[in-house]
């Protein structure tokens, strides 16, 4: 079972950890909703560090 980390980009351009999920669809939905509400870029990264997706607000 893969772990997916949700990260967001702060005002200085540094990626910060937000939370981890095991379901990719749920992770995308959470990141997408939070990107829209906060106006910050979010990304999904798997446990190997592979970039899965970047969500723009």
Locate the predicted segments by residue:
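Solvent-exposed serine/threonine-rich low-complexity stretches and specific carbohydrate-binding patches
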Residues: 19-23, 56-57
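Short aromatic-glycine-(Arg/Gly/Cys) micro-motifs in beta-strand/loop hairpins
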Residues: 1-17, 46
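Charged, amphipathic alpha-helical segments
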Residues: 22-31
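Short, mixed-charge low-complexity intrinsically disordered segments
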Residues: 35-57
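Local beta-strand/beta-hairpin segments that build beta-sheet-rich folds
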Residues: 17-18, 52
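Sterically constrained small-residue positions within well-ordered secondary structures
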Residues: 18, 33-35
């Amino acid at each position: 079972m893969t772990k997916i980390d949700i990260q967001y980009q702060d005002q200085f351009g540094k990626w910060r950890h937000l939370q981890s999920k095991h379901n990719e669809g749920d992770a995308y939905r959470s990141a997408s909703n939070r990107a829209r509400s906060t106006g910050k870029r979010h990304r999904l990264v798997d446990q190997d560090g592979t970039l899965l997706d970047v969500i723009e607000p």
